[in-house]
Amino acid sequence: ANQLILFIMVFGLYVIAHGHLTPGGGFQGGAVIVSGVVMLLVAFSSQELKKSVRERILTIMESSGALIFIVLAFAGLGTVFFYNFLVGTPIFGRIPPTGPGSGDFWTGGFVPLMNFAVGLKVIAGLSSVVLAMALFASGEESEE
């Protein structure tokens, strides 16, 4: 479990980051990352995982993901819906190629950033659900 968790997390981040180019996105990548949390839960006990994961941190992560998504949605509405604000900046100065399958990471405008916000929300939400189910199954109650 200790050797696989890094690969699962990196693959989940890859799925989140490239969701606008390939099948995937924030929800799918978040679910992949939470499958790593489930693997840790199976390999170790729920009490061990409860020591390292706090409910408050998961709540803050989930709320932050929703807030970031809403802010980016309104920022995109300010100019053109999902306007690619990265074009013309010193780092990404060239105009990206258009058309399906261009393969350039920065052609998605706000969509990759919104995928990260959705991924953050899904990771926190599903982790909370999985940990609550594990603690309930072990006979321990949550401290809410």
Task: Kindly give the residue locations of the regions a language model identified.
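Interfacial and helix-entry/exit segments of alpha-helical transmembrane bundles
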Residues: 1-8, 49-74
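Short, hydrophobic/aliphatic alpha-helical segments
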Residues: 2-21
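Juxtamembrane non-transmembrane "cap" segments at the membrane-aqueous interface
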Residues: 71-98
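Short, non-helical or kinked segments that cap or interrupt transmembrane helices
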Residues: 20-34
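Alpha-helical transmembrane segments and their membrane-interface exit regions
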Residues: 33-42
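Hydrophobic alpha-helical transmembrane segments
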Residues: 102-127
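Cytoplasmic juxtamembrane regions at transmembrane-helix boundaries
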Residues: 130-144
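A cytosolic-side transmembrane-helix exit/cap motif
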Residues: 43-56, 107-111
